[in-house]
Amino acid sequence: MSDLAIPTISCTESDGKYGRFVVEPLEKGFGTTMGNSLRRILLSYLDGVAITRVRIDGIQHEFSALPKAKEDTLDFLLNLKNIRVESLSGLEGILYLKASGAKVVTAADIEPSNDFEVVNPELYLLTLDSDDAVLNVELEVELGRGYRAPESTENTPIGTIPVDAIFTPIRKVNFTTEPMHVGRETSLERLVLEVWTDGTIEPATAVSRSADILVKQFAALVSHNKVVAEVEASEPVKYAIPEEKYNMPIEQLDLSVRAVNCLRHAGITTVGEVINRGTKELLTLRNFGLKSLTELEDRLKTIGLSLNPEEELFEDAENSKKKNKGMDEA
């Protein structure tokens, strides 16, 4: 049986777009192994949202002149690519940008949507320099991962301009390893992982999802016979939840619109289905982060339920044993 050190992770700094994490203790060499793996997953394999096509009234292609604006169409498109969007519903769709008159146009001028949130509304897009200027733009928003080059086909309508899309929500990842000792053991090390995001995902959520991807990929390498034996030996544990609470629609929990949309997109419509998923599986849902999880846990507590009923049952059993033991001693 392996006697390798089992590490723990702690977040030592976080501001929504930046997170610093320390993983320790690790056997010598594991810091680089883990750091490299997490870095590659973070930068390349997390889902994100990006603008993929643009339609501008009066503009046929990217080399057309943009009337009554200081920027040309190419510069405008380059600025549009920097808009960072979070999908609240987990769906693709269209955003609309409308402006008129002489003004500085920013991402804040994009019309509000129930399905999307622009996380950098202060982003500069262009300047209209005439009082009679009118700008109408449609932005196609898609889900994906990594980077995708512009896609133009014979069926692309005239006036639709494809743009290269950067889906990854991660801007930068750094990691370092440091030597450490625990007691007399001096051959251990710690991993320091720094993550910068674009604001559409929290650093802690990004690290959690990346680790989950790695676990699922490595699970395929586990002995097939061992997996089958464990599955056959395990029996499902059922927890008694009143039927009226089990079948309660998630809307009755008074969750935020964002949390409800994330759950419904994953096919979760009742409180019972939420509890069946559990904490770990919920955190793998698209756009369902730690804030949504905390909100959900708080709402469940108000109706006397928990995302981890097995832990509560264990605690109740332990408390009961201690109580009975105290009575016996008395």
UniProtKB/Swiss-Prot annotation:
GO BP of this protein: DNA-templated transcription
Listed EC numbers: 2.7.7.6
The keyword Cytoplasm is annotated on this UniProt entry: no
SMART domains: RPOLD
Key word Cell wall biogenesis/degradation present: no
Reactions catalysed according to its record: RNA(n) + a ribonucleoside 5'-triphosphate = RNA(n+1) + diphosphate
SUPFAM superfamilies from the UniProt entry: C-terminal domain of RNA polymerase alpha subunit, Insert subdomain of RNA polymerase alpha subunit, RBP11-like subunits of RNA polymerase
Single annotated GO MF: DNA binding
Any Pfam family matching the protein: RNA_pol_A_bac
GO cellular component, as recorded: cytoplasm; DNA-directed RNA polymerase complex
Region Alpha N-terminal domain (alpha-NTD): start-end pairs: 1-225
Free-text domain note: The N-terminal domain is essential for RNAP assembly and basal transcription, whereas the C-terminal domain is involved in interaction with transcriptional regulators and with upstream promoter elements.
Binding partners and assembly: Homodimer. The RNAP catalytic core consists of 2 alpha, 1 beta, 1 beta' and 1 omega subunit. When a sigma factor is associated with the core the holoenzyme is formed, which can initiate transcription.
Protein name in UniProt: DNA-directed RNA polymerase subunit alpha
Native species: Dehalococcoides mccartyi (strain ATCC BAA-2266 / KCTC 15142 / 195) (Dehalococcoides ethenogenes (strain 195))
Protein's gene: rpoA
